[in-house]
Structures are given as C-alpha cells and as structure tokens.
Regions:
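Extended extracellular/luminal ectodomain segments enriched in beta-structured repeat modules
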Residues: 29-36, 70-74
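Short, surface-exposed beta-strand/strand-loop-strand elements in extracellular ectodomains
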Residues: 46-58
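A short beta-strand element within beta-rich, extracytoplasmic domains
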Residues: 34-43, 77
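A short aromatic-anchored loop/beta-hairpin motif
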Residues: 15-20
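Acidic, glycine-rich loop-and-strand cores that form catalytic or ligand-binding grooves
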Residues: 130-132, 155-217, 221
Length: 281
C-alpha cells in the first residue's frame, strides 16, 4: 500500500493517509476501538492540457464518520483518480464498455471505504449495505465553464458558458445526474458509482465528441456533450456514526486538507483517504 503513516506519541494513536494507487487497498484495524474515516473525492478534468486555460473542473467532495470496531476487521479503500490526461478514464469512475473518451474529458473518481472488496464502487450496486462512506468526485468541463463540484449529499450542477455547450446535473442520494446533450446526441445519465456522459456525432458538431463526464459518487453526476460542463457526484454516509459531508464548492464550512494542517474549498487533483485511530477499548 502507498501511504504515509505517522504516530502521535502523546496520544499513542495512529494516522494513515492513503493516496490514489488506481487499485483497491486494504486496512486492518489493529485493535478494537473507534476510527475516524475521512474521504476526499477527486477533481474532474478539462479539455486543455494547460490547467484552467479554458474552463474549470469541479473539485472533489468530502465525507467523514466514525467506525466503531468491535473486533479487528479489514476494510477496503478505493481512492478516486483525476485522470492522467484529458481522454483517459479515471479510476473509480469508469463507465462499462468505454476505454477512453476520445475527444472529451473525464469526471473525477469517487473515494469510498467498504467492508468487502468488489473493485470499483459501481460494482456495489447490489451490495450497498457493504459501503461505509463515499466522497463524490467533481465533474469534467470540456471548454469554457465550470464543472459541478463533488457534493455533500447532492452533487453540484455543471455550468457551461459556450453557445452550444450543455450542462449535466449533480447526482443525488437516490438518482444519477441528468446528462445535457444537443438534439440527436447520445445521452448516458449518471448512475450508481459512475458519472454519465454525452456523445456528439458528426451531424451535430462535425466531430465525434464525448464532451464532459460527470463525477463519480454514490450516484454519479450527469455528463454534457460537446463543449459542455458536467455535474458532480454525490457523497454518502452509511455504516458509520457522526457522519458529515462537505461539498467541493463549500466556503462555509470548508473541508479539512488531507494532511490536517489547513482548510480548503474542495479537493484538487486525486482524491485521498485518512484513517485515524481515536480510542482503544
């Protein structure tokens, strides 16, 4: 596992920071006690290789809660990815049947913790009771505009400022976001674990364009075809207590940073996960 581990000698409590490895990681609680789980979703992507040259992707949401471990147990962590380039698929936000977005840009991957290992979050659609916590990823933005932030319990809508651009809505606690498309374009809405996307064919834009993908999340954000801005994915609190979520565009309150040293308005880049042991029983 790729992580940074620090020991607080004053309290004899441990902290584990898990970064994006593009695979499922595991953590076994060493002793019975309370563990604070913190998750940050990943930021979306834009069309330009120059950051923020044309538009702004949505930033990742945040979730936290307390896991009360009554016996040593193993939990599984999937940290969302901001895709490595504008057309690649982000880990923990991969639509079935797609290997890239050709022309377009992906949404940020969700970050989640589960009690079993079934791979990416989308594979838990029939096993939702195994999901402890989710932080939604931000929506992509193909051209001028703003991708929707990863949500609290509802992802934020995208906002395109181009004449032909469409916008995707954020995912919610019960439904995926709606993908905005031009007439005649293909539309795939957000769904459990995965952001939606649109597809513009030669008749509408003289290109084969996947536009912007919604952020991953409990329910993924809606995408947007051809020059659009996609919605963010929703966050989720499941098998933990004292849970709360903070959207990726929230200014009050702000999110804590993964290193615990400051605050931020949304998560930039890849997601993250922090596990802190709070008590011994």
């Amino acid at each position: 596992m790729d992580y940074v581990k620090n020991i607080d000698l004053c309290r004899c409590l441990s902290l584990l920071l898990v970064v994006c490895t593009q695979k499922v990681e595991e953590f076994t609680t060493p002793v019975v006690g309370d563990y604070k789980l913190q998750c940050w979703g990943a930021e979306g992507k834009t069309q330009s290789s120059v950051k923020y040259k044309y538009g702004f992707p949505g930033k990742g949401g945040y979730s936290e809660g307390i896991l009360k471990s009554i016996k040593p147990a193993t939990i599984y962590i999937s940290v969302g990815q901001q895709s490595s380039n504008k057309t690649s698929i982000a880990f923990n936000n991969s639509p079935n049947g797609l290997t890239s977005f050709a022309i377009g840009c992906s949404g940020g991957g969700a970050t989640n913790i589960t009690t079993t290992n079934r791979g990416e979050l989308k594979n838990f659609a029939s096993y939702r009771n195994e999901v402890l916590i989710v932080a939604g990823g931000g929506g992509g933005c193909e051209w001028n505009g703003q991708g929707g932030a990863g949500g609290d319990f509802v992802g934020k809508d995208g906002n395109s400022t181009t004449a032909r651009g469409r916008k995707g809505t954020g995912g919610s606690k019960d439904y995926g976001g709606i993908t905005g498309v031009l007439p005649g374009d293909t539309s795939v809405n957000g769904m459990f674990g995965v952001g939606g996307y649109g597809y513009a064919n030669n008749d509408t834009c003289e290109c084969n364009d996947y536009g912007a993908q919604g952020g991953g999340g409990w329910y993924g954000g809606g995408g947007a075809s051809y020059t659009g801005a996609a919605g963010g994915g929703s966050s989720y609190i499941g098998g933990v207590t004292d849970g709360k979520t903070i959207a990726g565009d929230s200014t009050n309150p702000k999110q804590p940073t993964p290193d615990g040293k400051s605050e931020q308005i949304g998560q930039s880049g890849n997601g993250a996960c922090v596990i802190t042991q709070l008590s011994f029983n």
